[in-house]
Structures are given as C-alpha cells and as structure tokens.
C-alpha cells in the first residue's frame, strides 16, 4: 500500500477506536450510568428478577368491543331445537 491509504486507514481505525471507547457505558440492568459498586450489583439483580416475575404473570384483558351475534350460533340453535323436536316426536 502507498503511504496515503495507510495513513487514511490508520486515522479511520483510530477514529473508530476513540468513538467506541468514549461512548455511553451501560451497566447492570441495561441502565445508563457509570460503574456500579459491588454492593449495588445484588440490588440490580434483585430488581431484574422482580421485573421478570412481573412480566411472567399472566395479564388479563377485557374485550370492550361489542361482538355482533354470529349467524352460525343462530343456525346451531335452530338445528338443536329441530333435533330436540324430532327426538321428542319419536318417543
């Protein structure tokens, strides 16, 4: 390689290293901040365990939309009543 492309590649690599090293540090629990004390590590893990347990609980949702009457349900009801009439006439 010629000296100019080597110099450009070196500057690009240096720039990427500086940007990567000076970026935001994410610590325990994926929360922004600096380094944590060893005492806070247990608290962070306990907090994460509580969040996981809360998310693992089944969530109940209520349907507030009005569901129109199904024509299949009407047909099923009519067939059931017809069958009852037929069996009632035979006995």
From Swiss-Prot:
GO BP: any one term: regulation of signaling
Record-level GO cellular component terms: extracellular space
Site (Cleavage): 26-31, 33-34
Site, as annotated: Appears to be essential for biological activity: 26
Tagged with keyword Ribosomal protein: no
Keywords annotated in UniProt: Amidation, Cleavage on pair of basic residues, Hormone, Pyrrolidone carboxylic acid, Secreted, Signal
Gene Ontology MF terms in the entry: gonadotropin hormone-releasing hormone activity; gonadotropin-releasing hormone receptor binding
Residue(s) carrying Pyrrolidone carboxylic acid: 24
Signal peptide span: 1-23
Keyword Signal: yes
Major localization class: secreted
Modified residues (Glycine amide): 33
Cellular localization per UniProt: Secreted
InterPro entries listed in its UniProt record: GnRH, Gonadoliberin, Gonadoliberin_I_precursor
Family according to the record: Belongs to the GnRH family.
Function comment: Stimulates the secretion of gonadotropins; it stimulates the secretion of both luteinizing and follicle-stimulating hormones.
Entry protein name: Progonadoliberin-1
Biological classification of the source: Eukaryota, Metazoa, Chordata, Craniata, Vertebrata
């Amino acid at each position: 390689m010629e000296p100019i492309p080597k110099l450009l590649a070196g500057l690009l690599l240096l720039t990427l290293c500086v940007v990567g090293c000076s970026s935001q540090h994410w610590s325990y629990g994926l929360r922004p901040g600096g380094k944590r004390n060893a005492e806070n590590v247990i608290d962070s893990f306990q907090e994460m365990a509580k969040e996981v347990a809360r998310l693992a609980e089944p969530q109940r949702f209520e349907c507030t939309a009005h569901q129109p009457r199904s024509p299949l349900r009407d047909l099923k009801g009519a067939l059931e009543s017809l069958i009852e009439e037929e069996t009632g006439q035979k006995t």
